[in-house]
From Swiss-Prot:
Protein origin, superkingdom: Eukaryota
Bias kind Basic and acidic residues: ranges: 72-85
Pfam family, one: DUF5586
Renumbered residue ranges of the record's region Disordered: 66-119, 204-246, 364-385
Protein name per its UniProtKB record: Uncharacterized protein C8orf34 homolog
Classification lineage: Eukaryota, Metazoa, Chordata, Craniata, Vertebrata
Listed CDD domains: DD_VEST1
Organism of this sequence: Mus musculus (Mouse)
Length: 459
């Protein structure tokens, strides 16, 4: 019985479209939200009564509602409930709610005292100048700023704590005896009203204390065994200029010739090193001794700025005599030139005897000049000339054989490389010499009159 009545009700509802009608009424109430819902529904039903012919369409669900709502409303207020946006329309409508949402709204109807918003609110245009209602980005920015402030506050707090700790440590260290300022030596012989005390201290070094002092014996193991010799920065410009002039005068006073041949370095270099601190590269033994260091290592004492004292190795060189017109007729000037020539260790003969015109005559003239100058030389130099003559006589036979073949030949030297270098020096010297009528040819050091005559008389 109940099932028959239920089927009859279901058929009635489906026949008269009661379900879609109520769905349409609910959607109109939800979308329009009028102040007086009952008169609004009555007006809507009266408008539906005049168009009953369209309700007979074979449409189902929400499609019938859309068709009925479009036909019932005037064209000015036509509304579309499709769920996608239409950017080409200025007033995009809200998407249509599903049936589940409508069922929920049927269960909990709106309260009668709820007021509906004016319809102009629904048709407001979007304005890009107005701020959005959502504050998400502003809140995020605010959170970031607050975190930065907190980070800065924490950093300042930690810095202040660290500074306070350092101040505490400094006060403890100042009160302690370990980091107490100390004076290593006593200054002797300096006036109290000295204008430049630092310069006086540099000139008069301190006298080292004895090792039985209590505070020095405690820290002698931990103190560094080196000292830096610092030039006072308060020196004026005039003092620096005077010191520079002294340094230049000391450098010019050194004899360069003697510094090359002498085995011992000059004494002035130590004064230069003491005056100029830029030359001081390694430890100063006086400073170490003044600090109380007993075991001094001489290997790292001080860098010597002097020239190297290597033994003078013989080098094959060719010297050119100056023209007699430029040199003058004074015989003493010529003897000085020949004495300087005699200092050169090795000698070289030109490449070929035939390459120079009048070689025999020029060699005879050189022999005569050597006879004149050898009378003015000292006995030590004469003995050195005799020694070179003896060494030359031993090699005379081989030289004569080379002269016959007219090959370029060299006088004996220590190594072949020295002969090659001497030959190159000779050729460059020949290019520099300007021959004239009164200019003597090459003078070879170490030769006297007899070997010159023998070379001239050779084949």
């Amino acid at each position: 019985m109940a099932s028959r009545q239920q089927t009859r009700i279901q058929a009635y509802l489906e026949k008269n479209k009661i379900g879609p009608l109520f769905e349409e009424l609910m959607t109109k109430l939800i979308t329009e939200t009028p102040d007086q819902p009952i008169p609004f529904l009555i007006d809507h039903l009266q408008s539906k009564q005049g168009n009953q012919g369209q309700l007979q369409r074979a449409l189902s669900g929400s499609a019938a509602l859309w068709a009925e709502s479009e036909s019932s409303e005037p064209k000015g207020t036509r509304r579309d409930f499709r769920s996608y946006d239409k950017p080409w329309q200025m007033n995009a409508k809200k998407p249509k709610k599903s049936k589940s949402d409508l069922a929920v709204s049927n269960i909990s109807p709106p309260s009668p005292d709820s007021k509906s918003l004016p319809r102009s609110v629904d048709h407001l245009k979007w304005n890009w100048r107005t701020k959005p209602q959502s504050r998400d980005f502003d809140e995020l920015n605010h959170i970031l700023q607050e975190s930065k402030k907190l980070g800065k506050a924490l950093e300042n707090l930690s810095r202040s704590i660290a500074i306070s700790d350092e101040l505490d440590k400094e006060t403890l260290a100042f009160n302690s005896s370990l980091l107490r300022p100390r004076v290593i030596g006593e200054w002797i012989g300096r006036a109290e009203n000295d204008a430049d005390p630092l310069a006086a201290e540099m000139l008069q070094p301190p006298v080292p204390r004895s090792k039985n002092d209590s505070w020095e014996s405690e820290d002698s193991s931990s103190s560094p065994a080196g000292s830096l010799k610092m030039e006072p920065k308060t020196k004026g410009l005039k003092q620096q200029q005077q010191q520079h002039k002294k340094l230049l005068a000391a450098m010019l006073s050194q004899d360069s010739f003697e510094s090359i041949h002498s085995p011992t370095p000059s004494v002035i270099e130590e004064d230069i090193d003491n005056e100029d601190d830029a030359m001081e590269l390694l430890e100063n033994l006086d400073d170490l001794r003044m600090e109380g260091v007993t075991t001094l290592v001489l290997s790292g004492s001080k860098f010597n700025q002097g020239r190297p004292t290597h033994p003078a190795e013989p080098q094959a060189k060719v010297t050119l005599n100056i023209c007699s017109r430029l040199q003058g007729d004074n015989l003493m000037e010529r003897t000085e030139d020949t004495l300087q020539i005699l200092h050169t260790p090795d000698e070289i003969i030109p490449d070929s005897l035939d390459s120079l015109p009048g070689t025999e005559e020029t060699l005879m003239e050189e022999g005569e000049d050597f006879e004149k100058t050898s009378n003015l030389t000292e006995p030590g130099e004469a003995s050195s000339g005799a020694h070179s003559l003896k060494s030359y006589m031993e090699e005379d036979e081989s030289l004569k054989q080379l002269q016959v073949v007219h090959q370029p030949w060299l006088l004996p030297s220590d190594t072949e490389s020295e002969g090659i270098e001497a030959e190159q020096d000779k050729r460059s010297a020949d290019l520099l010499c300007v021959p004239c009528s009164s200019c003597p040819t090459l003078i070879y050091s170490g030769l006297s009159v007899k070997p010159a005559k023998e070379v001239a008389s050779g084949p």
